């Protein structure tokens, strides 16, 4: 069993809880995920199983889409409403004020990650430092917000957004609050899409069954293929580096045997090609 499950995570569960539940349900030793969802968040979580646990790199650069709610007037140490309140301020703003803030952060801005995050600095995880009372001074990182639609409801803002990898929605909530001369925190978050993978395609762990597995070969449908003879296939299975004698492609490709079976996935590397994944 090698591939991915699209799981619809419930609130209150960690991403590791989902990994454990899938491992236990299907009696699979190798299980992982492609990107953490906070425990209070819901929505799409891509679970890797079997050999596909080595394919997380395929998902690293993918955009994500979310729905959520921002609560204004209070700041929390976690930048979401599961944390401790650390500041309060009155809320008074117009839609034009909100539009002005969005014009500053859409389509790109320098974002400081939340103190409670898994980012490491000098080998220390930010959330561990924050819990010890010594939060890290995290550098700002450029992120992209491709779209941000909203509905204002007095002291809350319901929104839908499409963002680049590495974007923290909690930080967006915090920064919108500060831009409105108050505070902001995330109270609801639901991940609806990871690139072409949709929450509508996902199931809860309880409803997930073996036929829902997307085979790892299907993750490479749009990738170029080359066919090698039996002698070279044996070398490929041992991790041999390929070069211009086998192909001149300047992009990743699948190696197939003469029967059309997927054998390996290779990527360009200094005018050669190195093995990235064995089927």
From Swiss-Prot:
The keyword tRNA processing applies. It comes from the Bacteria. Signal peptide: none annotated. The active site is at 38 (nucleophile). The keyword tRNA processing applies. It catalyses: uridine(55) in tRNA = pseudouridine(55) in tRNA. InterPro entries: PsdUridine_synth_cat_dom_sf, PsdUridine_synth_N, tRNA_psdUridine_synth_TruB. CDD domains: PseudoU_synth_EcTruB (cd02573). Coiled coil: none annotated. Its EC number is 5.4.99.25. One of its GO terms (biological process) is tRNA pseudouridine synthesis. Belongs to the pseudouridine synthase TruB family. Type 1 subfamily. PANTHER family: PSEUDOURIDYLATE SYNTHASE TRUB1 (PTHR13767:SF2), TRNA-PSEUDOURIDINE SYNTHASE (PTHR13767). Responsible for synthesis of pseudouridine from uracil-55 in the psi GC loop of transfer RNAs. This is tRNA pseudouridine synthase B. The gene is truB.
